[in-house]
Amino acid sequence: MLKKTLAALVLGSALVGGQAFAADYAIDKEGQHAFVNFKISHLGYSWLWGTFNDFDGDFSFDAAKPEESKVNVTLKTASVDTNHAERDKHLRSDDFLNVAKHPTATFESTSVKSTGGGTADITGNLTLNGVTKPVVIAARFIGEGDDPWGGYRAGFEGSTTLTLKDFDIKMDLGPASQTVDLIISVEGVRK
């Protein structure tokens, strides 16, 4: 479930901006400039939050032609982190992410549709736990501009909800925990 969340969020976040020209960006994951977080209901009483600490990706964006934007993200599934060592070990097992067999999750965009007001729907193929399914990330442009180090940056955020069984995650967590929400924020540095 964590793989889904990361891939979906990172890819969705990268395609919504307001850039005046086409440009390619590398996702800057240092210093929490980008993250792929997830949350899932814990027994229906609260939220269990987690993140993926190791991922890479890039995106291209042209505000004048958002439909030509592209996003690619690869997440290392063993980097799942819920701040609880035993739970993280279980999430890495074949009950959930099966990191020994599927060490990465990937997202590759297939289309971007502007929905107005700096938002877009990013559709793409998410491969998680050895299963590839189309997902839609609701993305929003945050901002862009020069940074203090001579570079140029653009930022996006996005979210999607994944159904665990769609990605062959069969562990029964109860009726309140059949889906996981992915929350993605990315800042890209223009190449």
Curated annotation (Swiss-Prot):
UniProt subcellular location: Periplasm
Entry keyword set: Periplasm, Signal
Secretion signal, residue range per the UniProt entry: 1-22
Domain of life: Bacteria
Pfam families named among the record's database cross-references: YceI
UniProt family annotation: Belongs to the UPF0312 family. Type 1 subfamily.
The protein's name: UPF0312 protein PST_3941
Organism from which the protein derives: Stutzerimonas stutzeri (strain A1501)
Lineage: Bacteria, Pseudomonadati, Pseudomonadota, Gammaproteobacteria, Pseudomonadales
